[in-house]
Swiss-Prot record:
Organism for this UniProt entry: Saccharomyces cerevisiae (strain ATCC 204508 / S288c) (Baker's yeast)
CC annotations in GO: cytoplasm; nucleus
Name used for this protein in its record: Probable diacetyl reductase [(R)-acetoin forming] 2
Residues that bind Zn(2+) 2: 120, 123, 131
Lineage start: Eukaryota, Fungi, Dikarya, Ascomycota, Saccharomycotina
Subcellular location: Cytoplasm; Nucleus
General function of this protein: Catalyzes the irreversible reduction of 2,3-butanediol to (S)-acetoin in the presence of NADH.
Amino acid sequence: MRALAYFGKGNIRFTNHLKEPHIVAPDELVIDIEWCGICGTDLHEYTDGPIFFPEDGHTHEISHNPLPQAMGHEMAGTVLEVGPGVKNLKVGDKVVVEPTGTCRDRYRWPLSPNVDKEWCAACKKGYYNICSYLGLCGAGVQSGGFAERVVMNESHCYKVPDFVPLDVAALIQPLAVCWHAIRVCEFKAGSTALIIGAGPIGLGTILALNAAGCKDIVVSEPAKVRRELAEKMGARVYDPTAHAAKESIDYLRSIADGGDGFDYTFDCSGLEVTLNAAIQCLTFRGTAVNLAMWGHHKIQFSPMDITLHERKYTGSMCYTHHDFEAVIEALEEGRIDIDRARHMITGRVNIEDGLDGAIMKLINEKESTIKIILTPNNHGELNREADNEKKEISELSSRKDQERLRESINEAKLRHT
């Protein structure tokens, strides 16, 4: 099977010979992949990993699967085959995948020495998104969506409405990350929010906050192209490089409703300066949420910035089925706009060119790229996109011609009056 696979730190490459996945457990299904987004975690696995992947020569604790594995966990596709225990999905359904691999999924790998291992405390209590052995389909547990096909159990698959294009459906997983953060902090409609960092998760948080009834959203982001995109998605924007950190914090607090800071802040950058800004830009009793993935290193912050104002600071990890279902419902109801969501996609590349044409581009050109999605192009997806772009350009040209014609007619009328 063709795939863009992880062989180890700094070693991602295309292969024609990845092992074809097959149904093992009765509730599994085969998904024909159309699109799969590249996540920041994928980039970190390349530059700093392995993080979720096992070390070379080792296997994953949940599945006992070794390297190499196809990367990619933001996937959308069509059901190709179903196991005898699949109840609610059928061949031909469009689906997205919740890619977590946890204690609850051990049964899928009956040959693993850990198949009967006791569940961790978090999984026992239903908090499987913070499983002690958490991995991802496409990042350690099993091969993911930078491949032609994936096998997944039905409980991790969600049907997508027919009107949602599969390139946008590939954004449902990162949007579920954002939705989970809003749920974790118990966001209240009518509140105000500051987002620090306008990468894919920061931009997705704009969409999730709008859907949740946020009154006012401000985004702090140094890159011009990302600020412009945040504006298109309905946020006010600020360039933090315009002033020193203290002046930026004072200014951001002043432009919040009431002039005394925001009800909620979302740190999507993961730097010492952004963590402290997220706390200090809160109003009293506000809540700061960390969505960023940090390295395991210590930083400095003042606990009294929290205590004196009875503020809260919390983390948010992954998602659960509630978040996938909520995002799909918001798309169905129009609370998340498909066209606005599609603004996040800045590139479409086939898996053969995924390393140089996408992963390295995201690493080296952060200011001009947001989200690149990959495809095995089994059904001419890239050709379809090219045809759609030509059609849009043609329609735009036609509209401009019509506008010019109307202007000429109006000018002629004015000359004869």
